């Protein structure tokens, strides 16, 4: 950062006189492709689709923190997911199935690889580490995360 600040300061000292006397040359920016626009972010974008790759879901969790947050449903309740990681193994279970739930996190089968939930928040409760969540909410292998309250 210090090197960049020094280089920027030197370039600014060299360039400012040309800007002030009107002799600085302008360069048109290339228009090779149209300007990309991002879609408006909505709450429903945070719904985790466990049929997708676990790496994609982990990036979604990071990208939607703090708002609107990534979420799923378990037994008719919303579960927000605040921190997760990818386990480099292929699950045999159906996507959305809990593979393991212990102090290391909640392992969930995905379309490719396994997503491990480390920090979650059940609706009406505070944000907590997965092991604290599991002390009050019994998840077991075979339980399913859903894409609706059903």
Name each model feature, range by range.
Residues 26-41, 46-48, 61:
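Anionic-ligand binding region
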Residues 5-8, 30, 50:
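Hydrophobic alpha-helical segments and helix-packing faces
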Residues 1-24:
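Conserved anion/nucleotide-ligand pocket segment
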Residues 45, 50-150:
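An anion-binding loop in the catalytic cleft
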